[in-house]
Curated annotation (Swiss-Prot):
Subcellular location field: Endoplasmic reticulum membrane
Similarity annotation: Belongs to the GSG1 family.
Originating species: Homo sapiens (Human)
Gene3D superfamilies according to UniProt: 1.20.140.150
Annotated Pfam families: GSG-1
Principal localisation: endoplasmic reticulum
Role summary: May cause the redistribution of PAPOLB from the cytosol to the endoplasmic reticulum.
Protein name, entry field: Germ cell-specific gene 1 protein
A cellular-component GO term for this protein: endoplasmic reticulum membrane
Keyword Membrane in annotation: yes
Gene name for this UniProt entry: GSG1
Superkingdom in the source lineage: Eukaryota
InterPro entries: GSG-1, PMP-22/EMP/MP20-like
Origin organism lineage: Eukaryota, Metazoa, Chordata, Craniata, Vertebrata
Length: 349
């Protein structure tokens, strides 16, 4: 009895561990899906022409239009001292499955009149422009040939989260219904299958989106193409979610297999310990089993029953407790009948 209680405690701990891993996987996958930090990097954007805010880096050069030295026919041309990469500004960007946001720099000439006071404060602190952020739909940035793959990736990701939620609910129900081993066995089986399917779908979704992003980097709009990019924290969180999902599936499968082996072992021992139930074996089974497999006659040996196939493990779990109780009851009643019969024979003698 102590061994059985210890086994139930270990099974409950494994189910709890699977539920915790499933909950972590569900939270990580949902966060990564809604995040815009799958990929981060910088964009190389040409700086605007010489304006008031950049006058220190520009100089004027008068150029005659008709070759004459007359100042009335001369035009002033502005030149910039900056060369090479100094002519470009590097702005950060971040991209996710839904939106792609990039840093913008608003020049002084484009500022609203009400923003001049704010611009003077920025200029006094050494900042030449007001920084902001512009977000665009990543679906619009994706090349038309890759949009179907992106939609498929989004659908697979949502299905991945849905299966994770179902698996978590099944494991939570298994924890609440600890008194019914047959129901717990079925819930563990469905939860394990759901976790494995969700993990495979999540892996496919992550790989498809990565391919779509790389194609967008090469074939997307020129004003969006990043100069340097790398993976963001949402990308790593998505794969961490996949790892937790598969760990939950392995733990649930381990719990299911252990329960199956325990019930088979107990089922075999019950017939070894109670041979009186063997001649009435067909009466010990539930009606669904006796109707499915008609009995030819009473069984005379344990091996004759032991070689018969069991229709399902869950059915064996359902009738196991009933089988054991009936075996003990039949054994006690048989002993009582023999005692009464022997006493009657002695009185007749």
């Amino acid at each position: 009895m102590a061994k059985m209680e210890l086994s139930k405690a270990f099974s409950g701990q494994r189910t709890l561990l699977s539920a915790i891993l499933s909950m972590l996987s569900l939270s990580f996958s949902t966060t990564s899906l809604l995040s815009n930090y799958w990929f981060v990097g910088t964009q190389k954007v040409p700086k605007p022409l010489c304006e008031k805010g950049l006058a220190a880096k520009c100089f004027d050069m008068p150029v005659s239009l008709d070759g004459d030295t007359n100042t009335s026919t001369q035009e002033v041309v502005q030149y910039n001292w900056e060369t090479g990469d100094d002519r470009f500004s590097f702005r950060s960007f971040r991209s996710g499955m839904w939106l792609s946001c990039e840093e913008t720099v608003e020049e002084p000439a484009l500022l609203h009149p009400q923003s001049w006071k704010q611009f003077r404060a920025l200029r006094s602190s050494g900042t030449a422009a007001a920084k902001g952020e512009r977000c665009r739909s990543f679906i619009e940035l994706t090349p038309p040939a890759k949009r179907e793959i992106l939609w498929l990736s989004l659908g697979t990701q949502i299905t991945y989260i849905g299966l994770q939620f179902i698996s978590f609910l099944l494991l939570l129900t298994d924890l609440l219904l600890t008194g019914n081993p047959a129901c717990g066995l079925k819930l563990s089986a469905f939860a394990a299958v759901s976790s494995v399917l969700s993990g495979l779908l999540g892996m496919v979704a992550h790989m498809m989106y990565s391919q779509v992003f790389q194609a967008t980097v090469n074939l997307g709009p020129e004003d969006w193409r990043p100069h340097v990019w790398n993976y963001g924290w949402a990308f790593y969180m998505a794969w961490l979610s996949f790892t937790c999902c598969m760990a939950s599936a392995v733990t649930t499968f381990n719990t299911y297999t252990r329960m199956v082996l325990e019930f088979k072992c107990k089922h075999s021992k019950s017939f070894k310990e109670n041979p009186n139930c063997l001649p009435h074996h067909h009466q010990c089974f539930p009606r669904r089993l006796s109707s499915a497999a008609p009995t030819v006659g009473p069984l005379t040996s344990y091996h004759q029953y032991h070689n018969q196939p069991i229709h399902s493990v869950s059915e064996g779990v359902d009738f196991y407790s009933e089988l054991r109780n009936k075996g003990f009851q039949r054994g006690a009643s048989q002993e009582l009948k023999e005692a009464v019969r022997s006493s009657v024979e002695e009185e007749q003698c």
